Regions:
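Accessory C-terminal helicase-associated subdomains
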Residues: 337, 343, 390, 480-623, ...
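Conserved short internal alpha-helix adjacent to the catalytic or cofactor-binding core
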Residues: 36, 363, 413-416, 424-459
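Helix-hairpin-helix
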Residues: 453-475
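Conserved helicase NTPase motor core
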Residues: 1-12, 16-20, 51, 59, ...
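P-loop NTPase Walker
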Residues: 1-98, 204, 258, 287-290, ...
């Protein structure tokens, strides 16, 4: 392997601080491994005093394996570890902690619940006496966030409770940790900093232990980790950091790309080296991604160039690309597995009047706008099938897991093998889908009590379960039970008429009528706190904590998305029986498809009748970090999805742009960007990021 001049400068760096800005596909792992080798073989550094810190176990393992392979599998006692592993080793050695000292997830939730018992019930959601799990996880994430950024809890604005209440929760949580002598993972860095500041002897000990520090993915570091690393490197200042501020996407965990710029202030003598050649992606992908990320203001200015030609072949390969799960190199002939190429209805994308249009001169970047998500999912699934038949690795990358459901369904229907790395819960099992199903079942399959109990007060109809003694519901019996309440007669008459209408409709129309005609969507808004409920004034609603209002808005958004999903799925079936069978089979089919895909990846075959075949992967933008594929699909490139509608300020928008950039730069040969246009009633708009890439949407 022959390194380029930029890599050579980084590898040959001896002592003192250095900041290596490594763009996508620029060989940062190769450079880091070679630098460790160079320290040992050329500068005669003691390998036992070299510490390489990464963010994930997989990255640490990969770097260690590549180092030992480079050293002809001879053993050298270099330490490769994650921040958590390294910091816990220090705390275990110096402070006598052990494995049982680490707070388990179950214990963490118990501590939080104990802290919440001191709060008025109005501050948290209740569901049959149980706390809203999403709300609970949100609070735990906020507690971890302020620990990582080193912020005082009194200065933090929670999305869920007031500042005063959050302060009480945080203090109680930390008090329980101290009493039980436990350590939260998010406390590791702060605990190491406390040890180093209060015990100079221990600080000196660990500074002697690690004379050379190398930090990978430095853009993902948080304030607490950075402070600990600065203390550890000591007066020798042998701190070699590698990262790319354009790929900083973990702000929700406290990571801050501004720390990279702060590094140059803290270490003004630091050598700064740019690894600017992307050996992964074709020129069109590199240029298009560069246009996008150039819109960010808070970044190191840099110009990334392609190390590939505009053809599919590499022009200048000077290092072995990073091994990834996504980039499986298949041996032998390309697959002839008969994956269907048409959509479920046999209609191609072209028949809808859509086509993939080139965004780059080498046609490595293609864009397409679709009418709705179903059409987008079917067309992308067909394109994935074509890509797999050509023996290429590919992935569909989404902003959130929920966005992947449409494509997963389309792939499943076509029996296209895929691996869903972060599969969410069955979308049919959401409370909203179960409500809509209960309405359909009550109208079309008999008046069962269990279905009526679920729907009778959604929206509110003032019906009591005590008036429902029988297994089947009779509206005549209900009218007799409420004979003394004239207003209930009108409610029951309207409900019976609505149920009769539903029984005569097709599934799609029935769901639409439930939502609009029977007031289910309006009830969702009231239930989420978006409209004043009975007896509540608009002023009283507005006095709720801002965090509580934001949480309510998020809940409504998810509920309406679930209703949209169910309604679109209902369109596909001729009868309720067909829909029920599909819902029942969904989880089993999905699990089986994923198992088959995993077996395919493990064995490299699809059975005796077929040759080798890659499998498609579905992954989020966060989960795609560090991976690469021949072809990448980025569906759902719409405003409100990416950038996410919650991105209200410049910093949040820039992180969204970095996420999109990370997704784009996973592609080696082909990059497909798509969006949906929607209808007049519910229009969709292409993401501003497409325009920043140079895309001009055709006139409708």
């Amino acid at each position: 392997m022959q390194e380029n001049k930029q890599q050579q400068r980084a590898i040959a760096h001896n002592t003192g601080p250095a900041l290596i800005l490594a763009g996508p596909g620029s060989g940062k792992t190769f450079t880091t491994v070679e630098r460790v080798r160079y320290l040992i073989e050329v500068h005669h550094a003691d390998p036992s005093h070299i510490l390489v810190i990464t963010f994930t176990k997989a990255a640490a393992r990969q770097m260690r394996d590549r180092f030992f392979a480079r050293m002809d599998n001879q053993f050298f006692p270099v330490t490769f570890g994650t921040f958590h592993a390294v910091f816990f080793h220090i705390l275990k050695t110096s402070c006598h902690y052990n494995g049982s000292s680490i707070l388990k997830e179950k214990e963490k939730r118990e501590y939080l619940r104990a802290a919440l018992l001191t709060l008025p019930k109005k501050f948290y959601a209740q569901n049959d006496g149980k706390m809203d799990q999403e709300w609970e996880q949100g609070l735990l994430s906020e507690i971890g966030f302020i620990k990582n950024i080193g912020k005082l809890p009194a200065d933090f604005t929670s999305e869920y409770v007031s500042r005063q209440e959050f302060m009480r929760i945080f203090v109680s949580f930390q008090k329980q940790l101290a009493q039980e002598k436990k350590l939260d993972l998010d406390d590791f860095a702060a605990a190491v900093c406390h040890l180093f500041r209060t015990n100079p002897a221990e600080l000196a000990r660990w500074q002697r232990e690690y004379s050379y520090l190398l930090v990978d993915e430095f853009q993902d570091i948080n304030a607490a980790q950075y402070e600990a690393v600065k203390l550890l490197c000591g007066g020798k200042r042998n701190l070699f950091v590698v990262g790319d501020d354009d790929q900083a996407i973990y702000g929700f965990r406290g990571s801050d790309p501004a720390i990279m710029r702060q590094f140059l202030k803290d270490f003004p003598e630091a050598k700064q080296i740019f690894l600017s050649v992307n050996y992964r992606s074709r020129a069109g992908i590199v240029e298009t991604a560069g246009k996008l990320i150039g819109q960010n203001r808070e970044r190191f200015p840099k110009q990334i160039v392609a190390g590939q030609s505009t053809s599919d072949e590499r022009q200048d390969v000077c290092f072995v690309p990073e091994a990834t799960q996504g980039a499986r190199r298949m041996q032998g002939e390309k697959s002839t597995l008969p994956i269907p190429t048409g959509t479920a209805s046999g209609i191609s994308a072209a028949a809808f009047g859509t086509s993939w249009l080139p965004l780059s001169t080498d046609r490595s970047v293609l864009v397409c706008g679709f009418q709705d998500r179903r059409q987008e999912a079917e067309t992308v699934a067909d394109e994935i099938g074509k890509t797999l038949r050509q023996g290429k690795s590919c992935a569909a990358i989404f902003r959130t897991n929920a966005d992947a459901v449409w494509l997963a369904t389309a792939l499943k229907c076509r029996k296209i093998p895929f691996l869903w790395k972060e599969k969410p819960k069955n979308p049919y099992e959401t409370p909203v889908c179960q409500d809509l199903l209960a309405y359909l079942q009550f109208a079309m399959e008999g008046r069962k009590r269990k279905d009526f109990l679920r729907i009778m007060n959604r929206p509110c109809r003032y019906l009591s379960r005590q008036m429902l003694p029988d297994a089947e519901i009779s509206f005549s019996a209900l009218r007799r039970a409420y004979a003394q309440k004239p207003y209930m007669q009108e409610i029951l008459h309207r409900l019976e008429a609505d149920i009769s209408r539903l029984a005569k409709m097709d599934l799609y129309a029935a769901v639409h009528y439930i939502r609009r005609g029977m007031g289910y969507d309006a009830w969702l808004k009231e239930n989420a706190g978006q409209t004043p409920s009975a007896g509540e004034s608009r002023q009283g609603q507005e006095r709720a904590p801002a965090g509580a209002r934001a949480h309510a808005a998020g809940k409504l958004e998810r509920d309406l998305e679930a209703a949209d999903f169910f309604q679109e799925q209902a369109r596909e079936f001729q009868s309720l029986t067909e829909l029920e069978e599909a819902m029942t089979a969904y989880e089993d089919q999905m699990d089986q498809n994923m198992a088959d895909a995993a077996d395919t990846a493990a064995s490299g075959t699809t059975g005796a009748a077929f040759t080798t075949l890659p499998i498609a992967e579905l992954v989020t933008m966060h989960g795609s970090k560090g991976l690469e594929y021949d072809a990448v699909f980025l569906p759902c490139c719409m405003e409100g999805v990416v950038p996410h509608k919650k991105s209200k300020n410049q910093a949040a928008l820039e992180e969204e742009r970095r996420m999109f950039y990370v997704g784009m730069t996973r592609a080696k040969k082909e990059l497909y960007l798509s969006y949906t246009k929607g209808t007049k009633e519910t229009p969709g708009f292409a993401s501003r990021f497409l325009a920043e890439c140079g895309w001009k949407e055709p006139k409708r």
